[in-house]
């Protein structure tokens, strides 16, 4: 995915369009392609990447929050359509993750400290923190799980 930060009234529409194309249109197209292959085979698993910003609006990142909210709703809508065809559609919703998308915030000592103090786990997530949930959702253990948006955020949303 990508991020566009700034005051909502100042964000150029071209930046909005690029972010929406990558963060939601591509997810929809890939889901369609996957479903077209899975339906004749009797099912499968689709795991989307939403965000903790699927649950709240964030600050100075309105295009990103809107697109990740759309991923969550698309996940639920596709689950409603495809669960009866054997396709489980779910999403993980990472919280603050130590990835290049957040380099600016991570490198700002004050902002980094503020965020870390709000995370009950007292640390940023790492990409490897996502794998257990993804493995679960892809496994037979999750055959009755569909339409779920699962936060992986060190407890942030539980506050």
Locations of regions flagged by a protein language model:
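Substrate-binding pocket helix/loop in short-chain dehydrogenase/reductase
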Residues: 7-8, 12-17, 111, 115
